[in-house]
Amino acid sequence: MNLLIVGLGNPGSNFLHTRHNVGFGLIDKLVMKNALSLRKAKNYEYADFNVDSRRIVLIKPLTYMNLSGNIFPCVFSKFYMKINNLLVVVDNVDLPLGKCRLRKVGGASTHNGLRSISESLGSTKYGRLYIGVGNNSAFGLKDFVLSKFNDSELVRVKNVFNFLSEEILGIDEFSFEHKIATINSSSF
């Protein structure tokens, strides 16, 4: 099974290391770990490579989070992918920092990036990898997800990226349930 991994985030250096950009962070880790470089297309960056005769495409949308769905007509066409190849990596404020959840399908909840994707695709039947970023009720939701991780939190997030960069490329139609168990039981 070919895999299209789309990490959500906001473009620009001012969003680096923010909670909302963990999807970008994991894509960056995968690019670095596999000695790749991102190439620029019209409204996204991508890297394309093979693992065990499977095509893996990594994507960072260059639209802002709320418009993430706009890239999919171009991406599916360019890379000959379909919705069943899609895995979206996204932040989740309902999960504690350092916890992850892999799902085959799901809803958008309060996440505007997922809502945009689901609207663009006309479906919610695509894979999601949620990365817990914690929650702080002292902040409003928008301010919290746009806040940067502190140093100790960033160490934990990097540990999550290290773990996921080992696990995520092995996801296929035969191993998905096993990967759900492995990833969902992890905590950093």
Swiss-Prot record:
Similarity annotation: Belongs to the PTH family.
GO biological process entries: protein quality control for misfolded or incompletely synthesized proteins; rescue of stalled ribosome
Origin organism lineage: Bacteria, Pseudomonadati, Spirochaetota, Spirochaetia, Spirochaetales
GO molecular function, one term: tRNA binding
Enzyme Commission no: 3.1.1.29
Top-level EC class: hydrolase
Protein name: Peptidyl-tRNA hydrolase
UniProt-annotated location(s): Cytoplasm
Function: Hydrolyzes ribosome-free peptidyl-tRNAs (with 1 or more amino acids incorporated), which drop off the ribosome during protein synthesis, or as a result of ribosome stalling. Catalyzes the release of premature peptidyl moieties from peptidyl-tRNA molecules trapped in stalled 50S ribosomal subunits, and thus maintains levels of free tRNAs and 50S ribosomes.
Cellular component terms per the entry's GO annotation: cytoplasm
Gene coding for it: pth
HAMAP family according to UniProt: Pept_tRNA_hydro_bact
Site (Stabilizes the basic form of H active site to accept a proton): D91
Chief location: cytoplasm
Residues that, per the record, bind tRNA: F15, Y64, N66, N112
Catalytic activity reported: an N-acyl-L-alpha-aminoacyl-tRNA + H2O = an N-acyl-L-amino acid + a tRNA + H(+)
Entries under Pfam families matching the protein: Pept_tRNA_hydro (PF01195)
Keywords for the protein's UniProt record, in alphabetical order: Cytoplasm, Hydrolase, RNA-binding, tRNA-binding
NCBIfam families reported in the protein's UniProt record: pth (TIGR00447)
UniProt site (Discriminates between blocked and unblocked aminoacyl-tRNA): N10
Self-association state and partner proteins as the record states: Monomer.
Native organism: Borrelia recurrentis (strain A1)
